[in-house]
C-alpha cells in the first residue's frame, strides 16, 4: 500500500482504490458556461430551458462544475434556477463539499513562484455555502474516490491532504481548521 488504510482521514499516499483518471467528453454548452463563469451565456441557456442536471462523462453537473472551478456567480445562478444541490459525481464530490474545498484549498502558486493561495475569496464563498445549506445540501454526504485534482498534488509531492474516501464537508473544513464552516455545518446536522 501507499500508506492509506481504510475509510477516513488517514494522511499520505493514494488509497488502494479510486485511481481512475477523469473521462473526457460529454460537455454541454451549459457545462462550458458554468466552468468558464460566462454568466450572461449561462443565464441565456437557463432562460431557454437548458437541462440543469445533465452531467459530463464523470457525472459532474453544471453546479458542481461551477464550484470546482471557483465560479461562485455561476454557481449562485444555477442554485437560484433550481439546480440539485445534492448531486454528486463519480468521485462522490457534492456541491457543498466542493464549496468547502475551494474555500480552504491553499496551495503555492508554483508557476509564479509566489506564496499566494488559489485566488479564492474566502469571504465570498461563505454566503454560497450558506445558500447550499438553506437549499437542503446534505452535510453528511461522503466522497467515494480520489478526484483527479488531488492526483497532481500527489505528483508534486504535496501529500499534506486528507484521504478522500469517505470525506464529508465537515472533515474537509476540520482539516483546514475552518471553524466558521465547521460550526455552520454542525448547526445543520453534520455528524
Question: Which ranges hold each PLM region?
Answer:
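Ankyrin repeat A-helix N-terminal signature
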Residues: 2, 7-14, 20-21, 32-38, ...
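Ankyrin repeat domain, specifically the short helix-to-loop turn at the C-terminus of the second helix
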Residues: 43-51, 76-84, 130-138, 183-191
